[in-house]
């Protein structure tokens, strides 16, 4: 049994095996109806709990479909359905759920909730997102890059805007998959030093460049994410927009990257803010392949968690 809690907590060889398996599973499904079962059914007769303290489209649908394609069933639980950390301890919730289900995926705010769930659960726990990390997304991103351009090792990735939880997982992935990462954004939105330090210790070149044009020069992949959260107050949104506007990914900025550079965004996007529709719908963009690959990457993650 394995937990999938973060990129840096998983062996690099296991991460590589998951990416390779995800690609093979995707190829095996080409041309099949979405509800058709996979040839192999590693989740047959298995029940997976999908816990959402934060709203979700891609995470919920991709995990639900993936479990069903591999022969399992899902139980979707929201914060309103549970007493997670309110009235009942997370430890007790983890112990109880372990008696009912074979695997737990949790999308939560506080990373400590994920850690405690994994500590006390007797079944695999998967990090569907926390305020500090989003490893499933980055596995999909690596898969997407490699199916379009080949191995990501040695490539230059540029992250624009806010050094948020997705950026943090990208830095972990830089260390584990051997690519370099340049962050371009205002100083107050820099990634945490521990994430950059991990990648540097692994031999990746991690650079902070305030000038977005200089940052994307020679880039193989340019990545953007939303500048604001649904929970931000209006005044905070306006302030963030003013600070981050110079880091918008538009056609002019992409012209400074390599001619065959890819553009990614984990979605949902605020079009014309962090990136323009011209870029998002243009020839560099692979955002919808990226969204689809959440399904395939997570199926490989679930198989790994169960040793299947």
Curated annotation (Swiss-Prot):
Pathway: Amino-acid biosynthesis; L-arginine biosynthesis; L-arginine from L-ornithine and carbamoyl phosphate: step 1/3. Carbamoyl phosphate binds at residues 56-59, 83, 107, 134-137, 266-267, 294. L-ornithine binds at residues 165, 225, 229-230. It is found in: Cytoplasm. GO terms for biological process: arginine biosynthetic process via ornithine; citrulline biosynthetic process; L-arginine biosynthetic process. SUPFAM superfamilies: Aspartate/ornithine carbamoyltransferase. Keywords: Amino-acid biosynthesis, Arginine biosynthesis, Cytoplasm, Transferase. It catalyses: carbamoyl phosphate + L-ornithine = L-citrulline + phosphate + H(+). The keyword Cytoplasm applies. It comes from the Bacteria. PANTHER family: ORNITHINE CARBAMOYLTRANSFERASE, MITOCHONDRIAL (PTHR45753), ORNITHINE TRANSCARBAMYLASE, MITOCHONDRIAL (PTHR45753:SF3). This is Ornithine carbamoyltransferase. It comes from Ruegeria pomeroyi (strain ATCC 700808 / DSM 15171 / DSS-3). The lineage of its organism: Bacteria, Pseudomonadati, Pseudomonadota, Alphaproteobacteria, Rhodobacterales. The gene is argF.
């Amino acid at each position: 049994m394995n937990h999938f809690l973060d990129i840096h907590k998983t062996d690099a060889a296991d991460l590589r095996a998951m990416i390779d398996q995800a690609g093979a599973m995707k190829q095996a499904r080409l041309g099949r109806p979405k509800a058709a079962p996979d040839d192999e059914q590693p989740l047959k007769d298995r029940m997976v709990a999908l816990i959402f303290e934060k709203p979700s489209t891609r995470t919920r649908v991709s995990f639900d479909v993936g479990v069903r394609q591999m022969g399992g069933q899902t139980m979707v639980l929201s914060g309103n359905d549970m007493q997670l950390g309110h009235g009942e301890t997370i430890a007790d919730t983890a112990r109880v759920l372990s008696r009912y289900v074979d695997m737990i995926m949790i999308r939560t705010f506080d990373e400590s909730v994920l850690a405690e769930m994994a500590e006390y659960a007797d079944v695999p726990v998967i990090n569907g997102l926390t305020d500090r990390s989003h490893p499933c997304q980055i596995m999909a991103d690596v898969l997407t890059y490699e199916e379009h351009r080949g191995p990501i090792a040695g490539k230059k990735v540029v992250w624009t805007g806010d050094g948020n939880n997705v950026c943090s997982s990208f830095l972990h992935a830089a260390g584990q998959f051997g690519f370099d990462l340049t962050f371009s954004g205002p100083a107050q939105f820099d990634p945490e030093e521990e994430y950059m330090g991990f990648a540097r210790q692994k031999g990746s070149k991690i650079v902070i460049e305030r000038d977005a044009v200089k940052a994307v020069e020679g880039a193989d992949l340019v990545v953007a994410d939303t500048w604001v959260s649904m929970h931000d107050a209006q005044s905070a949104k306006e302030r963030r927009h003013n600070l981050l506007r110079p880091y918008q990914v538009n056609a002019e900025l992409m012209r400074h990257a390599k001619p065959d550079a890819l553009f990614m965004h984990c979605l949902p996007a605020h079009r014309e803010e962090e990136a323009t529709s011209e870029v998002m719908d243009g020839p560099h963009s692979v955002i919808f392949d990226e969204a689809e690959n959440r399904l395939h990457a997570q199926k490989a993650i679930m198989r790994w968690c169960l040793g299947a």
